Amino acid sequence: GCPVPSNPQRIVGGSATTIDRWPQMAALLYTFNWNAYWHYCGGTILNNRSILTAAHCPANDPPTRWRIRVGSTMSNSGGVVHNIANIINHANYNSATQDNDISILHTATPIEFTNNVVAAAIAGTNYNLGDNQVVWATGWGATFQSGWNVEQLREVQIWTINQQICIERYATLRAVTDNMLCSGWLDVGGRDQCQGDSGGPLYHNNVVVGVCSWGRGCAQAYYPGVNVRVSRYTAWIQSNA
């Protein structure tokens, strides 16, 4: 799952990777003290001024609390850092239910594309994503608590999970809506997104189909990770990016 960062875990069961494999990735950097900015969430580059993430990352913060780093394998060094000019959370984002947990950050300066900085392909409205499809999650998954260390990008291969099964697994905890997409290694566990991976992408054939949103714990066999289902928001993304 992708809860709000609380302890310094990262992509579970995955392996280290490099930004040239996932050049659409952005690290979202947060400041507590208005001095140092540390990795706190993930994001995806949409175009030369927009980053897709989860609304629960910026929540109600002013844009000055956040910066983004692009083009670097390391979350807290390298690449290019951009200030954020404004934050557009989905108007129907509900922090209690985590429904519509999607947000776009606009950078103060244009993002320059390179081999390591590329705009993502996002799922269209009619994108057909079946059950048990191979998907990849990527992220740095470190919080400020371990932010003193250089953190390398990680990747993990997981699978899409049947919506009805996911609804039933979470029935006593929270509603899984049509706006959500479940992923993981069902009844095996050990692979998932985790704290600090929030807002980062879920890829299917290099198309972004999910945004890491929430879950019960991380990499549990019984509880899948839950993502924003990007295909439900294609029009919203295009009109706000």
Which stretches of residues belong to each language-model region?
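Conserved H-D interstitial segment of serine endopeptidase catalytic domains
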Residues: 4, 8, 28-31, 51-54, ...
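Conserved, non-catalytic sequence blocks in retroelement Pol enzymes and Pol-derived host proteins
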Residues: 13-20, 93-97, 127, 146-148, ...
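Acidic glycine-/aspartate-rich tracts in secreted/extracellular proteins
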Residues: 31-34, 56-61, 71-76, 108-113, ...
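Small disulfide-bonded, cysteine-rich extracellular recognition modules and tandem repeats
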Residues: 5, 14, 29, 60-61, ...
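Chymotrypsin/trypsin-fold serine protease catalytic domain
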Residues: 4, 74, 82-85, 102, ...
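Protease-domain processing segments flanking chymotrypsin-fold serine proteases, especially trypsin-like
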Residues: 1-52, 66-67, 179
